[in-house]
Amino acid sequence: MPSSDEQRAQLEAGIAALEAQRATLGNEMVEAMLGPAREKLAALESRSQSQQQRKQATVLFADVSGFTAMSETMDAEVVAGVMNELWAEVDRAVTDHEGRIDKHIGDEVMALWGADTAREDDPERAVRAALAMQAAVARFCETRGMTLAMRVGINTGPVVLGAMGTTAEFTAMGDAVNVASRLEHAAPVGGILIGHDTYSQVRGIFDVLPQDPLSIKGKAEPVRTYVVDRAKPRAFRMAPRGVEGVETGMNGRDAD
């Protein structure tokens, strides 16, 4: 049986061939013949979108503190324009670090690493993106005389990727996503809070401050958390082997 891609290619080729026969066969006949082919193509694409994948990903949530206060003193259209400009800068920090913008919800953004192409350093890229996002917000506020700050939560773990809900919106779901969202809400204003699963893959690369474990509904044990202070000038990735927490090896490389 042909694969989905092969079936799609065959249908698209057949549709193109029929389109080329309009002058000979006439629009009415071509449209009648195109109907079934288009329906099959639409069904194939819908089935493809509904397929879900399980992947290891790093999830980032961030929100802008001070947005509500700003909204109360400015016209709604002006606020929308300002936020669009700010999100353009923030989103660029994500994509510059090979992340994918999953969605914007009001003053919050969700981004993913590993959804499209998995990389060993996805957690590091996410944390570096978070630092770049905060720097972008600081520059934005400095040039406009505004007082805004961004808090960020980052977590790494298995997620389910696919088209979700009645709108078939492509997104990620799962425990790792829920934890990342909780980390964002628990993060200090202007801070980056990461879970232990992310920390275990970036230790030695960033200066971090251990925080109190975070209790999350539905999880048997509290999540160990860390506030990221900054990237180390020259970092070495600490590779845990054997027993977790015992760092017995390292791959030296500059933190570019």
Segments the model singles out, each with a brief description of its role:
Residues P2-A17:
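Short amphipathic alpha-helical heptad-repeat segments
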Residues A20-M29:
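Charged, low-complexity interaction regions
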Residues Q51, M74, T167-A168, R241-D256:
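Short linear X-Pro dipeptides
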Residues C141, N155-T156, D175-H196:
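Catalytic/regulatory signature loops of cyclic-dinucleotide turnover enzymes
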